[in-house]
From Swiss-Prot:
The keyword Cytoplasm does not apply. This is Glycerol kinase. InterPro entries: ATPase_NBD, Carb_kinase_FGGY, Carb_kinase_FGGY_CS, FGGY_C, FGGY_N, Glycerol_kin. It comes from Desulforamulus reducens (strain ATCC BAA-1160 / DSM 100696 / MI-1). One of its GO terms (cellular component) is cytosol. One of its GO terms (molecular function) is ATP binding.
Length: 501
């Protein structure tokens, strides 16, 4: 027996697959990352090829092991964290997907959502799942596949198909088709799972017309689900022992273990989660109630504000407008101006998420004058991340009656000091950036390590959280209010735009 020295985190994101090795001191020993194809068949539709995701994920596993020179048998366990809601349905006999994976950002099921709302079912879904009826969540995506891909409805009725979010798909592949499971956090994003009773909800499945036989078994976020088939994992059998959706994993990696602690992750989208312990808060302000994780025999809940477009707005400046060479350049250009000169950019490219939930909103740049420069537009795009975060924090404080003391942040954009300073200024609370900003992968590693005794307790893990920098708010309150009022006006102009004539 070789000593177990590492935990491997698989981070299956929206645009890339990553494999990150952590040692016992939670240091990153190796990282491999590879992007995969984004498929846009029609405006507002987004797909991924699930087979390509698997081969990309397997490729980075092999790469990180080769690059670091470690032996696969030194890996104590594997943790998986994933883009949530993205839906794949596959044939359980052949292992082949019946259609591309439908991505969380995809709006194709807007009409299915409208039908559910017209039938007056929104409250029922909200009460049971903690979610709003929106094209974002998995349930309507599964329904769309069964309604639109020829032959799938019959196969589903015969019990020949399986549904999974990306965690489920990867575990199924890694175990050679032996294990069909998900965890509480991912199940809570499907629109089919009752977060109070902790079971798949037959009434909701009836409304969506999805057979129970498709659904995975729901387990805790930290337990041994199964073992890798040696031929699917570099010739070795390693326990898969931790799973959480990417945002819940980041909350765990940020050591937000006490009720009232919150983090904001800046990625493709922006996601703020606040731990609410065993309280299920029903949001009056457009937030989601979700399961943070299942651990030690109990479930922890969270309030979540989901912002669809954050870093993706900067990618659009780079790829769409081509006014940036690379995303990090945004800080350089934005720092060339004192502010936006009255310009606001509302990145509602895929509708608006929390707290507005307007599927028909579209992007807008307002306040343009002849004096507007590319620097102003870049600055306005960065500022939009901070404004959207303020929208969500306001809703969170109203729902929970908890006044946030500080906001922990993570994700790629937190390296941008200008953005982080503006975030602190516009919120009026300190913004805390940790030393390890890979908190999503860290959270998955922690869950997997705890399950096999690689780490003892979450108390031990909480002590490891270290601050890199605290951004203090220096903006005067009247200035903050003036800027934010302008933002609210700009959002109003972007709403209810994409209407059918």
């Amino acid at each position: 027996m070789m000593a177990k020295k590492y935990v491997l985190a698989l981070d299956q994101g929206t645009t890339s697959c990553r494999a990150i090795l952590f040692d016992r001191d939670s240091n990153i020993v190796g990282v491999a990352q590879k992007e995969f194809t984004q498929i846009y068949p029609k405006p507002g539709w987004v797909e991924h090829n699930a087979e390509e995701i698997w081969s990309t994920q397997y490729g980075v596993i092999a790469e990180v092991v080769a690059k670091t020179g470690i032996k696969p048998e030194e890996i104590a366990s594997i943790g998986i964290t994933n883009q949530r809601e993205t839906t794949v349905v596959w044939n359980k006999n052949t292992g082949k997907p019946v259609y591309n994976a439908i991505v969380w950002q995809c709006r194709r099921t807007t009409e299915i959502c409208d039908e559910l709302k017209v039938k007056g079912l929104e409250e029922t879904f909200k009460k049971k799942t903690g979610l709003v009826v929106d094209a974002y969540f998995s349930g309507t995506k599964v329904k769309w596949i069964l309604d639109n891909v020829p032959g799938t409805r019959e196969m589903a009725e015969k019990g020949e198909l399986l549904f999974g979010t990306m965690d489920t798909w990867l575990i199924w592949k890694l175990t050679g088709g032996q294990v069909h499971v998900t965890d509480y956090s991912n199940a809570s994003r499907t629109l089919m799972y009752n977060i109070r009773e902790l079971c798949w909800d037959e009434e909701l499945l009836g409304y969506l017309n999805v057979p129970m036989s498709l659904l995975p078994t729901v387990k805790a976020s930290s337990e041994v689900y199964g073992y890798t088939q040696p031929d699917q994992f570099l010739g070795h059998s390693v326990p898969i022992a931790g799973v959480a959706g990417d945002q819940q994993a980041a909350l765990f990696g940020q050591a937000c273990y006490e009720p009232g602690m919150a983090k904001n992750t800046y990625g493709t989208g922006c996601f703020m989660l606040m731990n609410t312990g065993d309280e299920v808060y029903e949001s009056k302000n457009g937030l989601l109630t979700t399961i943070a994780w299942g651990l030690d025999g109990k479930v922890t809940y969270a309030l979540e504000g989901s912002i669809f477009i954050a870093g993706a707005a900067i990618q659009w400046l780079r790829d769409g407008l081509k006014i940036l060479e690379s995303a990090p350049d945004s800080e350089y250009f934005a720092s060339k101006v004192d502010g936006t000169d009255g310009v606001y950019l509302v990145p509602a490219f895929a509708g608006l998420g929390a707290p507005y939930w307007d599927m028909r909103a579209r992007g807008a740049i307002v306040g343009l004058t002849r004096g507007t420069t590319k620097e102003h537009i870049i600055r306005a795009a960065l500022d939009s991340l901070a404004y959207q975060t303020k929208d969500v924090l306001g809703a969170m404080e109203a729902d929970s009656n908890i006044k946030l003391q500080a906001l922990k942040v993570d994700g790629g954009a937190v390296a941008n000091n200008l953005l982080m300073q503006f975030q602190a200024d516009i919120l009026g609370v300190p913004v805390e950036r940790p030393q390890v900003i890979e908190t999503t992968a860290l959270g998955a590693a922690y869950l997997a390590g705890l399950a096999v005794g690689f780490w003892e307790s979450k108390e031990e893990l909480a002590k490891r959280w270290k601050l890199d920098y605290q951004f203090e708010s220096v903006m005067a309150e009247d200035q903050r209010n003036k800027l934010y009022n302008g933002w609210e006006k700009a959002v109003g102009r972007s709403m209810d735009w994409a209407t059918e004539e």
